[in-house]
Amino acid sequence: MLFTSGDWYVDTEKEITYPLVTWMAEQFASLKDATIEINQVDLGDEFAYGFCQVDEDNEFLIHIHNRLNIEEYVTTLIHELIHVKQTLEGMLGHDEREDEAYSKELPLSNQFWDSRQTVH
């Protein structure tokens, strides 16, 4: 289940967000039944484009900087969704998590954009 919150300046109509989350769930089955909230917020003072939190009910909150361009937004959301997948699959080591997320974010971003071009 997907929820959105915050001050949306990137993808205000969620024309990329919803298809991207669906596409990622097709790539990683563990995401299919996850409860995820995407919160666009000004992270300018945080020195980060995004970060992911999980609560005691195993519900995920992804904060994403709301001043990214659409390409940065997609790459960042993919990175954070990889962290959701990792948590669901029990991968908890920080370095291992970041290594995987950074190594997969750009290839997955390119695959997502390619899949969008074949639809139109």
Residue spans of the language-model regions?
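Non-transmembrane alpha-helical segments in soluble domains
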Residues: 21-25, 78, 102, 106
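Hydrophobic or amphipathic, alpha-helical segments that drive membrane association/targeting
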Residues: 1-8, 12, 36-45
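Post-HExxH zinc-binding segment in Zn-dependent metallohydrolases
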Residues: 93-120
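Zn2+-dependent metallopeptidase catalytic core
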Residues: 11-33
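Active-site scaffold of zinc-dependent metalloenzymes
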Residues: 39-71, 84, 88
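Short histidine/acidic/glycine/proline-rich micro-motifs that form metal-
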Residues: 8-10, 68, 91-92
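Short alpha-helical catalytic segment bearing the HExxH-like zincin motif
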Residues: 72-80
